Amino acid sequence: DTRRRSVLIPQLDFPERPNYEYQQPNVVDLEVSDEELIRISEEGILALSLLEMQTIREHYRKPEVHEARKSFNLPQMSPTDVELECLAQTWSEHCKHKIFAAKIEHHDKETGEKSTIDSLFKTHIMKPTEDMQEEVNWLLSIFHDNSGVISWSDNLNLCIKVETHNSPSALDPYGGAMTGIVGVNRDILGTGLGARPIANTDVFCFGPPNWQGNLPENLFHPSRVLSGVHAGIRVGGNESGIPTVNGAIVFDDRFIGKPLVYAGTVGIMPRLLPDGRESHIKTPAEGDLVYMIGGRVGYDGIHGATFSSLELTEESPSSAVQIGDPITQKKMLDMVLEARDLGYITCITDNGAGGLSSSIGEMAEYTNGCEIDLGAVPLKQSGLSSWEILISESQERMTVAVHPDDQNAFEELADLHEVEHSIVARFTTTGLFHVKHGESTVALLPLNFLHDGVPQLELESEWEETKLEQFIPPSAVD
């Protein structure tokens, strides 16, 4: 039959992408009442306490700050929204672990003893580990990189990182868990000069999947959280080529309100690179070019660090959960490891909590300064404001420092692997976190204030005598 047959092709109507226009940075007036400071923090999802807001206000009252800002045409006594958002991400509980670092007045009611604990982290985690490091030769890198590094053999180092992704998994079980596992994969990739992720692990704690009681509005049923989290971890690992080698699941009523989602990755790196450098030591220098490679920046993941530092409520924004793309990350991973072995990388870290504000801000501590151009950052869509570009946690991005002599070779390698790359900053020695958008300066923060200016939290704790009850195991019949 040679007669023509018509084929009906269904037509799909796709929504048009909204065309947002770029908005100039706003000035945030902090010379207001305490109540207004709290309102600014809460409505902006900044997760800053009143004391922290007051500390920021005091910074902008200093004459030396006025003088430094004058030459950059910045408001002298008030932060821009870019600066305030950057401080909020850097000072968030998610990034600073302020509870672990708090000064705690402790009262043991059982013995009557009172004591002061100046940072649980420093006294009960850092000090024992540092004491151990003095006695062994296999603890190579602790407490200052994306993961800890130990010597595994004469030729290989091993690194392990585990972190939680609880709030994102409560709002979007699939997306929250996927970005949790691919994010911790990037932590391994961003350790030292780059490690290869070889295995994933996880522990999940959910409410009972057969729960039949009431649930608050906008809270997913535990069975949906279970299936979504499991699928997100599985897909994130499989599409990145990294197997999940073990895990555990716990069910308990305590996890109905918020699940506990641990995602972990194991990585390996050669002890020495072909050029003789030790793989666990970053070597940036003034003038190095800072690239953002991999994915683009979008509206997803904005306020991820601050929202996860707050109590989960019905108003918690789902936009704080990032959108994962493991295949893009796989291409980037292969390219980074090849660049490492070719000697192109001087420093590397991932774009996780806080986005570029965190990654470049942390790397800048090595040289004591940086200058960022947000206008050079590739975007998923137009119209993002300066502060949104700086703190967005859009996934599949690494920040990589390269010596200017290796610029062409690095870019050719990225093109070969089809990995997008853009020079977004340079390292300086000014002591400043200097952010521009094109020719205009939109943020100017001293690095020491950005990283060490957060006031120490003060807490009280009590220990009461425990009353143990006899445990009667259920019978086999029960």
For every predicted segment, state its role:
Residues Q395-R397:
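Short, solvent-exposed beta-strand edge segments and adjacent coil->beta transition regions
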Residues D1-T328, V336-L342, G352-L356, N368, ...:
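Core nucleic-acid recognition elements
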Residues A364-A376:
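A short, contiguous, amphipathic alpha-helix enriched in charged residues
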Residues L374-W387:
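Short amphipathic beta-strand starts and helix->beta connectors
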Residues T346-T349, T399:
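Short catalytic-loop micro-motif centered on adjacent basic/acidic residues
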Residues D406-E412:
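Short amphipathic alpha-helices within nucleic acid-binding modules
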